[in-house]
């Protein structure tokens, strides 16, 4: 993964209270208008103490940040190009997802959104 994204993730994690975070994996997701991501937990990593750092690029999206049970109503958090979200500690296993992406065009990425989800997988 490009060093610049590792640096952004490391600095954002430190600012959120997760000093020493060193991502070793990056999940890249591309969304087109109408695409969504259902509520889920990121719990397949060996190290669940390390945070998740999400970098949004392209079209705006609405991030859903729920509770520890899928049935808990999630908060809606608007995300724009360049936004970074960090969650870890007790929030690490909260359900989260993305509302269906609205139509639009971004000057750099066109009709799409790209999300980089950096984490410590191993």
Functional labels for PLM-detected ranges:
Residues 1-122:
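Non-heme Fe(II) oxygenase metal-center motifs and adjacent flexible, charged/small-residue loops
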């Amino acid at each position: 993964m490009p060093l610049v994204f590792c640096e952004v993730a490391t600095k954002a994690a430190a600012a959120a209270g997760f000093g020493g975070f060193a991502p070793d994996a990056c999940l890249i997701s591309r969304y087109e208008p109408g695409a969504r991501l259902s509520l889920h937990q990121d719990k397949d990593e060996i190290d669940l103490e390390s945070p998740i750092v999400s970098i949004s690029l392209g079209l705006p999206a609405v991030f859903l940040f729920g509770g520890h049970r899928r049935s808990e109503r999630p908060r809606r958090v608007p995300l724009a190009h360049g936004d970074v979200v960090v969650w870890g500690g007790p929030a690490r296993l909260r359900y989260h997802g993305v509302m269906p992406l609205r139509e639009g065009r971004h000057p750099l990425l066109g009709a799409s959104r790209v999300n980089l989800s950096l984490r410590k997988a191993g």
